[in-house]
Amino acid sequence: MSHSWDYDAIVIGSGPGGEGAAMGLVKQGVRVAVIERYHNVGGGCTHWGTIPSKALRHAVSRIIEFNQNPLYSDHSRLLRSSFADILNHADSVINQQTHMRQGFYERNHCEILQGNAHFVDEHTLALECHDGTVETVTAEKFVIACGSRPYHPADVDFHHPRIYDSDSILSLQHEPRHVIIYGAGVIGCEYASIFRGMEVKVDLINTRDRLLAFLDQEMSDSLSYHFWNSGVVIRHNEEYEKIEGVDDGVIMHLKSGKKLKADCLLYANGRTGNTDTLALENIGLQTDSRGQLKVNSMYQTALPHIYAVGDVIGYPSLASAAYDQGRIAAQALVKGEASAHLIEDIPTGIYTIPEISSVGKTEQQLTAMKVPYEVGRAQFKHLARAQIVGMSVGTLKILFHRETKEILGIHCFGERAAEIIHIGQAIMEQKGGGNTIEYFVNTTFNYPTMAEAYRVAALNGLNRLF
């Protein structure tokens, strides 16, 4: 690479995508700078998204577990915790993550520049520092990894003290008794679980006809039932007409004519790429209506020396995938091509209470494709480990080809689902005939474990064959 630039490459953003790219580049001997607009590294994933919401969920789920455990159910020892207490737990996790990630950059001699960056020309960025000064930095190549933020429709007053998005909800100052969540996607469903777990009344407004329609229908139905059973009110096929902030809460007027009132509103319907401040018009790059950039298989934009990874390119918008995209882009940036690529079947983890996780095809997809598949199921309530820990709600479902025994999809609903799924994923990724449901019958599992669900489900499925 040329040394006439300040850096060989500049990475914009220090979230999972930016970190993956920066670490991948510096390990290949590239002179790298990472630009971060906030005081701490980690991006939205660490500070407002994945990490804090999962820390909240964990704290709430442990409270639920304690209160539902028959050992402690004499009603005189019910655990309670305020939202503020649980947020303090999330803050401690964020601080640990930030400290650890800062160490990655320091150990690898990767320079971090703090401030807001925008393109002046195809190789120059203007950096507005926190003290108000502006400096320019140049590089031969760039990786845009600036992430996304919650979508804000113009007719919703997000300055009102009772109207929140998925970022600002982490600064909730009062103890709500009733919350409206608008948008029943992954974020909306996760927060519905958290608030209901804290005994807050929840109205979940879904603009579609079922929850998380990309999931296998049984998993979606299981979540709907679990929400219904815990007291979450789900309203499908609804859209807001007007959102009205009042002194003591929020009134939502729906297009169907209904009205709802609650202490606060969490608006969780869509996200937009953080590209509007990059002055991409100065270099001729265009985004779509959601602020996202188009890239090729090597994560190059329309300008071959500028790459983009993570939420800013859209699907799959997962922290796990963003890190891998960053590593792949780093390899392509240095070598001209990348030997690595994203796996075809990216696992999905949804941190509701209980969790949902899946990898591979759904029953609906396989039916539409006319693939002759069979189903193997294991109910958690029949597993010794689940009985011991009092986690009997849940199921593991394996979809496999009737003739070849190849595993086509795995779907799990229940506590630790996002961990359990990876056992099956490891077998699904095997080549040369290694992907077979018979592996789970022919191997020995520790006992008692949740992993044993795979043996139970495999036997259940194979017994259906004739």
From Swiss-Prot:
Keyword 4Fe-4S: no
GO BP: any one term: 2-oxoglutarate metabolic process
Origin superkingdom: Bacteria
Enzyme class, broadest EC rank: oxidoreductase
Co-factor binding comment: Binds 1 FAD per subunit.
Known catalytic reactions: NAD(+) + NADPH = NADH + NADP(+)
Keywords linked to the UniProt accession: Cytoplasm, FAD, Flavoprotein, NAD, NADP, Oxidoreductase
Annotated Pfam families: Pyr_redox_2 (PF07992), Pyr_redox_dim (PF02852)
Gene3D superfamilies, sorted: 3.30.390.30, FAD/NAD(P)-binding domain (3.50.50.60)
Function: Conversion of NADPH, generated by peripheral catabolic pathways, to NADH, which can enter the respiratory chain for energy generation.
Record protein name field: Soluble pyridine nucleotide transhydrogenase
Source species: Klebsiella pneumoniae (strain 342)
Taxon lineage: Bacteria, Pseudomonadati, Pseudomonadota, Gammaproteobacteria, Enterobacterales
